[in-house]
A protein has these predicted regions:
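Short acidic/polar hinge/loop motifs at secondary-structure boundaries
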Residues: 1-20, 103
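Periplasmic-side early beta-strands and strand-to-turn transitions of outer-membrane beta-barrels
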Residues: 32, 45-47, 67-156, 186-189
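Face-selective signature of the C-terminal outer-membrane beta-barrel domain
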Residues: 106-124, 150-299, 374-382, 431, ...
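Structural signature of Gram-negative outer-membrane beta-barrels, strongest in the C-terminal barrel
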Residues: 120, 221-225, 231, 257-384, ...
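Surface-exposed extracellular loop regions of Gram-negative outer-membrane beta-barrel proteins
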Residues: 132-133, 138-139, 241-249, 314, ...
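Outer membrane beta-barrel strand-and-loop segments of large Gram-negative receptors
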Residues: 205, 209-215, 257-264, 268-270, ...
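Gram-negative outer-membrane beta-barrel transporters
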Residues: 277-278, 382-384, 405-492
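C-terminal beta-signal and adjacent terminal beta-strands/loops
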Residues: 386-387, 391, 438, 478, ...
């Protein structure tokens, strides 16, 4: 998939700090194009064991933390959803089921050494609620049949495990990191959603990476710091695909079936230096990174993927700072792209295969009113993308295929696409002050990629206007109220292809296909959502109780989106009815997918 679901696999209660880099990425953090988000998990308490239990309307959660010895501690979290029960009760056609775990173990045998072991993983299943399409007397019977006919069943699990050793020295430290991560992704569909029928789509892929990084950080004289290091990764990928695809040039369905696997070495090196000048009013930083991989012959030479970056921060007046950065960044093509095969040949792994590139420039002002914990910043940015993968079949950038769930990149591509994004962001932050806190962020952005004719068109992420306001008030006696207001401009979308309503195409796909000659030529309306949450906490001698009530989408606003195109169906059986006026085709009908449901929730949190 190209975007996450409503619940992240990282439990935010275990997060101590998040560093977000919209530019000026640290040279030690590679394989990123547009931004980097670095999570730091909190260390467990070392005095006693405690427990935190959460019971909400969508999931159960348990967090434990405490000492595992005189110089070590452990914090771990487990969550299990029952959101599928709620979705089934209100008659939704899909039933998401998720489970996840997370832990961090820390040992400090002496003042010079620290060892950290981190792990997280998730098991996600996406079921179809076939029971809602059994009663033809229901008002929305035909709509449910249509949606169930278009959805795949998905199975996914993944994990990441790693160990880090920090060796502290008088002038800095050494850091050694070894880790392993794996993703298993399955998507399939039976004809008419009947397991007795053959599979019409069957996709299974696995990504496995074993990583090592050695990093040296030095504190030098005169306010100067330096970081350098090397990295190595051993990756394995396999893919089994069986499906049919519509060829837009011929209008015919073509079979695609292959099995592919490869192993690859990835390697790189980095260096970065920072220095504070002018009585620490000016901070400058410069870095360089190179990366290479044996996944394709065009990726082997690391000197082709050199990524310089430079940044500066100047405090020109009390509370005021000017920041600017520029850089070139590289990212390896997705394994799904590199693993696509025709026969025995991986057609996207050739001399012409290249890393994706981004050249960006960011500059802005920041004012920090520390007396009242208030911060204001404004920033402008430009990012230019090169070597973006272009679908050989559809002639569009894969970046324009990624605004929904599904498999992206499992096809032949060329690496000659261009894209760009530019805009500005305003941020106002009120840290806790007299019980109040809040954050307001407004972003104006234009995001564009080339279409098949070489013209820039809006990308699938081109919201243009995004406004987010989060705030709250802490009262005495354990009461707290929080709100979040989100406003987002409408996303562009591509209309459906008239040829996908042919009997041959619809009987196979069960859904309309898109007309990429009209790529993102339509746009949805703007969207807003208001969430409200109220907490009441009671503190006892050895435990505390938090009862919360929240309402998501309190105003009942519907998400604007294009109608779901279906075909005329038999009202008793749900079967498509051939057109009486256009032989070989079905007639169209439209389903309004807008859903403005108000979602109340009630839960408790117990800390022991």
């Amino acid at each position: 998939g190209a975007s996450g679901g409503p619940v992240g696999m990282i439990n935010v209660d275990l997060v101590e700090n998040i560093d977000f880099y919209a530019g000026a990425f640290p040279a030690a953090r590679g394989n990123a194009l547009s931004s980097v988000m670095e999570f730091s998990f909190k260390e467990a308490r070392t005095d006693e064991w405690t427990a935190n239990m959460v019971v909400g309307t969508s999931d159960l959660g348990l967090t434990l933390e405490g000492p595992t010895g005189e110089k070590s501690s452990l914090i771990m979290s487990m969550r299990r959803s029952y959101l599928q029960l709620l979705f089934e009760a209100i008659g939704l056609p899909f039933l998401p089921i998720y489970n996840d775990y997370q832990f961090k173990w820390t040992a400090r045998p002496d003042d010079r050494n620290a060892i950290t072991v981190i792990g997280l993983g998730a098991l996600d299943n996406f079921e179809l609620n076939l029971g809602i399409a059994q009663d033809s007397a229901q008002d929305n019977y035909l709509d449910q049949v249509a949606i169930l006919g278009a959805l795949d069943i998905q199975r996914q699990w993944n994990y990441t495990q790693g160990v880090k050793w920090d060796r502290y020295q008088d002038n800095g430290k050494w850091t050694f990191v070894a880790s392993r991560n794996m993703l298993n992704n399955r998507a399939f569909k039976h004809l008419d959603n009947d397991e007795e029928n053959p599979l019409i789509r069957d996709y299974l892929s696995q990504e496995i990476e074993n990583k090592f990084r050695a990093e040296r950080k030095l504190f030098l004289k005169e306010g100067m710091e330096a970081t350098y290091g090397v990295l190595y990764e051993y990756a394995k990928y396999n893919n089994s695909t069986s499906e049919k695809r519509l060829n837009p040039a011929t209008g015919a369905l073509e079979s695609v079936a292959f099995q592919s696997d490869f192993k690859a070495h990835k390697y790189g090196a980095f260096v970065q230096a920072n220095r504070r000048l002018m009585q620490e009013r000016l901070t400058v930083s410069a870095g360089m990174r190179i990366d290479g991989s044996t996944a394709a012959s065009g990726l082997v030479n690391p000197l082709k993927q050199w990524s310089p970056r430079v940044s500066a921060s100047f405090a020109f007046a009390p509370g005021w700072t000017f920041n600017a950065n520029a850089g070139m960044y590289s990212q390896l093509p997705a394994y799904t792209i590199l693993g696509y095969a025709v026969g025995d040949a991986r057609v996207n792994a050739t001399d012409s295969t290249s890393y994706l590139n981004n050249r960006q420039l960011v500059a802005g002002l920041k004012w920090d009113g520390s007396e009242k914990n208030f911060v204001v910043s404004v920033e402008g940015f430009f990012k230019g993308y090169q070597n973006s993968p272009i679908s050989s079949l559809q002639g569009v950038a894969l970046a324009n295929l990624g605004a929904d769930f599904g498999v992206v990149g499992n096809e032949a591509v060329t690496f000659d696409g261009l894209g760009r994004s530019y805009g500005a962001e305003l941020l106002l932050q009120q840290r806790l002050y007299k019980g109040f806190y809040g954050l307001l962020a407004y972003t104006f952005v234009r995001s564009e990629f080339e279409d098949s004719s070489g013209e820039f068109v809006p990308s699938s992420w081109d919201n243009r206007h995004i406004l987010s306001m989060t705030g709250g008030k802490k009262f005495e006696n354990g009461w707290e109220i929080g709100t979040r207001l989100l406003f987002s401009g409408g996303l562009p979308y591509t209309p459906t292809d008239a040829g996908s309503y042919s009997i041959e195409s619809w009987d196979f796909y069960g859904r309309p296909l898109l007309d990429y000659s009209l790529l993102n030529s339509e746009r949805n309306g703007a969207f807003h959502q208001l969430d409200i949450r109220i907490d009441k906490k009671w503190f006892f001698e050895r435990w505390s109780l938090d009862v919360f009530m929240e309402v998501q989408n309190a105003t009942g606003a519907a998400v604007p989106q294009p109608n779901f195109s279906d075909v005329v169906r038999n009202p008793l059986t749900g079967a498509p009815v051939p057109s009486q006026t256009q032989p070989g085709f079905y007639d169209q009908r439209q389903i309004d997918p807008s859903n403005g449901a108000i979602l109340p929730a009630l839960g408790i949190i117990i800390e022991l």
